[in-house]
C-alpha cells in the first residue's frame, strides 16, 4: 500500500508509516508488513499451538525398527503356526526398513524387495501383514485387487490404493511414504490366457501393467477423494519408493502347475518318485518358481517386482484349536472379556473348542471362519445376558456348539447356565 494520499509507505495491516515502526517488509503487489504486526501474528500462532520455529521430526523417527528375531517373537504372540513364513517376512521387513532408514548414505543402491504371499483362505496372510505394520509403527492399508481396472475403464485406478494408505496416515504424506500396503486377491488379476489376445484384458494384465510403476517406486498423483482423475482436480503427490507392498492370494491351481513341472523334471533312473497326492498345497507352494507364476497368468515384469515369495500352510485342526485359545487376542479371550464386562464368567470345554475347529475345517474357511462360527454359538447368550442379572457363569460344551450351529437351533441349554446365589 503506497499510503493515504501522502506518498508515505505504510504497513498494509496496521497503517503505520515507515517512520513509526522499526522495519517494513515488502511483499507482492505493493503490500507491506511491519515488525509489530509480525510479532502479533507470531503470538496468535503460538496461542493456537502452531510454532513456526519448531523443527518437525521426520516420519522416519516414528519407525520402530526391531531385529528379525524380535519381529518373529511379536508375530508369535498373535499368529499361530506358519513359522517359516514368519521368519521370511521378519527378515524381509527388517531389511526393507533398514534400507529406508539408511537413506542415500550408502554407495551401494539398495533395491526395494516387495513380498508375494501364497496361501489358502484363512491361513493368516492379512493378519501377518497387519501385525508387522503395527510393531514397526507405520501406516497400513488393505486393497482388493479385484476392484482394480486399467485406467479409463469402469472400476478403481491403481492410484486409489495409495489413497487408502494416505488416509491411514491421516493425510501425513511423509508417514504414508514409509507405510505398508497389502494387496489381497492378487491372483485374481492374472492374464485370462497365456496366448496373445486382440481383446483388451482391463482387469487382468492391464492392472498388472498399471501396478508396475508404483511397486517399483514412482512419483504418483492421487485423487484426494478417490475415483477417476480429471483435469480440474488437485492431486496429492506421493513417492512410492519406500512403500512396502505385500501381495497375497490363494493361487488356486498353482499347485497343479508346480506338480506338473516337478513330475516332468523328476523323470529318470535317479529321480525321487513322489506321487501328486503326497505333495499338499503348502508343500507345492514352497517349490514355486517364476515360470510357474507366468504359466498361472502373472506377467514376468510383475513377478520381478515381488522377488520375495512366502508360502503359508493350510491350517490343520490343532492349529485352529491353538488359534482359538493361545494368541493374546484369541477369540475365546475376547468373548471371555465381553462377558466379564457384564459380570458373567465364561468357560469353553475342550470338546466345545474341538467342535468349533472341526466346523471351520468342514467349511474350509480356515481361521477367518472361526469368528462367524463363534458368533453363531454365542448369539443367544449375548442377547440374553445383559437383561438377566441372575446369571453368574456360562459353560459352553460340545452340545451347546452343535445346537447353536443348527439353523433352527434354540437357546443354550439351561443346564450350562449358573445362576447367582440368592442374596
Swiss-Prot record:
Transmembrane segments: none annotated. Keywords: ATP-binding, Chaperone, Metal-binding, Nucleotide-binding, Zinc. GO terms for cellular component: HslUV protease complex. GO terms for biological process: cell division; proteolysis involved in protein catabolic process. One of its GO terms (molecular function) is unfolded protein binding. Pfam families: AAA_2 (PF07724), ClpB_D2-small (PF10431), zf-C4_ClpX (PF06689). Component of the ClpX-ClpP complex. Forms a hexameric ring that, in the presence of ATP, binds to fourteen ClpP subunits assembled into a disk-like structure with a central cavity, resembling the structure of eukaryotic proteasomes. NCBIfam families: clpX (TIGR00382), PRK05342.1 (NF003745). This is ATP-dependent Clp protease ATP-binding subunit ClpX. It comes from Agathobacter rectalis (strain ATCC 33656 / DSM 3377 / JCM 17463 / KCTC 5835 / VPI 0990). The gene is clpX.
Amino acid at each position: 500500500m503506497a499510503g493515504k494520499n501522502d506518498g508515505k509507505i505504510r504497513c498494509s495491516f496496521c497503517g503505520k508509516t515507515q517512520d513509526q515502526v522499526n522495519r517494513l517488509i515488502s511483499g507482492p503487489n505493493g503490500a507491506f508488513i511491519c515488525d509489530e504486526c509480525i510479532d502479533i501474528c507470531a503470538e496468535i500462532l503460538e496461542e493456537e499451538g502452531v510454532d513456526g520455529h519448531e523443527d518437525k521430526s521426520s516420519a522416519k523417527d516414528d519407525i520402530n525398527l526391531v531385529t528379525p528375531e524380535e519381529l518373529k517373537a511379536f508375530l508369535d504372540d498373535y499368529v499361530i503356526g506358519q513359522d517359516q513364513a514368519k521368519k521370511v517376512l521378519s527378515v524381509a521387513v527388517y531389511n526393507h526398513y533398514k534400507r529406508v532408514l539408511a537413506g542415500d548414505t550408502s554407495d551401494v543402491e539398495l533395491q526395494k524387495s516387495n513380498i508375494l504371499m501364497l496361501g489358502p483362505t484363512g491361513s493368516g496372510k492379512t493378519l501377518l501383514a497387519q501385525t508387522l505394520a503395527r510393531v514397526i509403527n507405520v501406516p497400513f492399508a488393505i486393497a482388493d485387487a479385484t476392484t482394480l481396472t486399467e485406467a479409463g475403464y469402469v472400476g478403481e485406478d491403481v492410484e486409489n490404493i495409495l489413497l487408502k494408505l494416505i488416509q491411514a496416515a491421516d493425510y501425513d504424506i511423509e508417514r504414508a511414504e514409509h507405510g505398508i500396503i497389502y494387496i489381497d486377491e492378487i491372483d485374481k488379476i492374472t492374464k485370462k490366457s497365456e496366448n496373445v489376445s486382440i481383446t483388451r484384458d482391463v482387469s487382468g494384465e492391464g492392472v498388472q501393467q498399471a501396478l508396475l510403476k508404483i511397486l517399483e517406486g514412482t512419483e504418483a498423483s492421487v485423487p484426494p477423494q478417490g475415483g477417476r482423475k480429471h483435469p480440474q482436480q488437485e492431486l496429492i503427490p506421493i513417492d512410492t519408493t519406500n512403500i512396502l507392498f505385500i501381495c497375497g492370494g490363494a493361487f488356486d491351481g498353482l499347485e497343479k502347475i508346480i506338480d506338473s513341472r516337478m513330475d516332468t523334471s523328476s523323470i529318470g533312473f535317479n529321480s525321487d518318485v513322489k506321487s501328486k497326492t503326497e505333495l499338499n498345497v503348502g508343500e507345492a507352494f514352497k517349490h514355486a518358481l517364476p515360470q510357474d507364476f507366468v504359466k498361472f497368468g502373472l506377467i514376468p515384469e510383475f513377478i520381478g517386482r515381488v522377488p520375495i515369495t512366502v508360502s503359508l500352510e493350510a491350517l490343520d485342526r490343532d492349529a485352529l484349536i491353538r488359534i482359538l485359545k493361545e494368541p493374546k487376542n484369541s477369540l475365546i479371550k475376547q468373548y471371555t472379556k465381553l462377558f466379564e464386562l457384564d459380570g458373567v464368567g465364561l468357560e469353553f470345554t475342550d470338546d466345545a473348542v474341538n467342535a468349533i475347529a472341526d466346523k471351520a475345517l468342514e467349511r474350509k474357511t480356515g481361521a477367518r471362519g472361526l469368528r462367524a462360527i463363534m458368533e453363531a454359538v454365542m448369539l443367544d447368550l449375548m442377547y440374553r445376558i445383559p437383561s438377566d442379572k441372575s446369571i453368574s457363569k456360562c459353560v459352553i460344551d460340545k452340545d451347546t456348539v452343535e445346537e447353536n450351529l443348527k439353523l433352527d437351533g434354540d437357546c443354550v441349554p439351561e443346564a450350562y447356565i449358573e445362576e447367582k446365589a440368592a442374596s
